Swiss-Prot record:
Involved in nucleotide metabolism via production of dUMP, the immediate precursor of thymidine nucleotides, and decreases the intracellular concentration of dUTP so that uracil cannot be incorporated into DNA. It is an enzyme of class 3 (hydrolase). This is Deoxyuridine 5'-triphosphate nucleotidohydrolase. The gene is DUT1. It comes from Eremothecium gossypii (strain ATCC 10895 / CBS 109.51 / FGSC 9923 / NRRL Y-1056). InterPro entries: dUTPase, dUTPase-like, dUTPase-like_sf, dUTPase_trimeric.
Length: 153
């Protein structure tokens, strides 16, 4: 018998999902290569023109260790209807219902129907042990203090 190193078993990170009502729909990916998981509305609501609203999902989840969940807009809603998302960070220790803040930048009311995909959840890695150090000044960079489009002129 030879001494061979044990094979490493790679297990995929787990996104734990709790469906809190019969109207809840588990997040899904639109394709195998999609960056985010589609998040679904659990009930009908209306986002007023030039207003905002909170969309129920009746879903809670725990993101994998070392990540947080970023609630991101769906490009189709933005382009076709002027709908954007807001307040988009879900911490690993948050276990309540994830609700989606939608902003309507159009003049017309936008009707959300139960089962509509209203946002996407993107899992992003975090650095959770960075030490905060207060300094007198920062290292020089070629960009300097230029912001808000300064690199593209």
């Amino acid at each position: 018998m030879t001494d061979q190193p044990a094979k490493k078993v790679h297990s995929a990170p787990t996104l734990k999902v709790q469906l809190r009502s019969e109207n809840a729909i588990a997040p899904t990916k639109g394709s195998a290569a999609a960056a985010g998981y589609d998040i679904y509305a659990s009930q009908d609501c209306v986002i007023p023109g030039r207003g905002q609203g909170l969309v129920a999902t009746d879903v809670s989840f725990t993101v994998p260790v070392g990540t947080y969940g970023r609630i991101a807009p769906r490009s189709g809603l933005a382009v076709k209807h002027g709908i954007q998302t807001g307040a988009g960070v879900v911490d690993r220790d948050y276990t309540g219902e994830v609700k989606i803040v939608l902003f309507n930048h159009s003049d017309r009311d936008y009707a959300v129907k139960r089962g509509d995909r209203v946002a996407q959840l993107v899992l992003e890695r975090i650095v959770d042990d960075a030490e905060v150090v207060v300094v007198e000044s920062l290292d020089e960079s070629s960009r300097g203090e230029g912001g808000f489009g300064s690199t593209g002129n």
